[in-house]
Each structure stands twice: as structure tokens, then as C-alpha cells.
Regions:
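Structural signature of tandem-repeat unit edges
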Residues: 1-2, 8-25, 35-48, 58-71, ...
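Consensus positions within tandem repeat domains that build extended binding/scaffold surfaces
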Residues: 8, 28-30, 50-53, 73-76, ...
Length: 107
């Protein structure tokens, strides 16, 4: 499968498992307002996280970014109030609003 943009529509179903092995771009708003997301581990190959991609995921606690990541969009994780860990490599372009409202963010 060729790497490219993939967008998933979930229609308010409970999120159990998502295979993102062929994602290179996480679309805008793709997982916004998901209270069932607790941990995200993005696979190698993901280069960009779109604006508001994980906005208001209020139970999200941890994000693991791949070394391939180059950019985190505007408000990508805004108001993820339980997010405690989000570690990315030096040189990643991070919008100043990417983690706005993440009041428990330690790293």
C-alpha cells in the first residue's frame, strides 16, 4: 500500500483499535472529541499531525511520536486536559497552540 493521507470517520462508535501503519498524515479533526482515547502511539512514517486532530480528547494521557514526525499542527492536542506525556524529537515544527489547555503536561 502506498503511503498517503487517510481519513477515518468513526460516527460516535467506541474506539477500540486503529491500524495507522500506512498513515503519513493525521487529518484535521480526525480524532477530536474522543473520550475513549487514552494512549496514542503513532507509527514510523507519520510526518504531520493536522490541526485539531486530537482536540478535546479529555482522557488522553500519553502520546508517543515517531522519529519521522516533522510537524504538529495548530491546536492538534488543545484541551487534552489529562495529557501528561508528549515527547518528540528536536527539530519538530510545533505550533504554539498545539498543546494549549493541556494543564497536566509534564514532558
Amino acid at each position: 500500500m502506498k503511503r498517503g493521507r487517510i481519513k477515518v470517520t468513526l460516527y460516535n462508535r467506541t474506539l477500540k483499535e486503529i491500524d495507522m501503519s500506512d498513515f503519513s498524515y493525521i487529518s484535521e479533526d480526525i480524532f477530536s472529541n474522543r473520550s475513549d482515547v487514552v494512549k496514542i502511539e503513532l507509527p514510523e512514517g507519520v510526518k504531520k499531525i493536522g490541526n485539531n486532530a486530537f482536540e478535546n480528547c479529555n482522557n488522553l494521557e500519553e502520546v508517543i511520536f515517531p522519529d519521522s514526525l516533522e510537524e504538529i499542527g495548530q491546536e492538534a492536542f488543545i484541551n487534552c486536559v489529562n495529557l501528561k506525556s508528549a515527547v518528540y524529537k528536536k527539530g519538530v515544527k510545533v505550533d504554539p497552540t498545539s498543546f494549549k489547555g493541556c494543564i497536566q503536561l509534564e514532558t
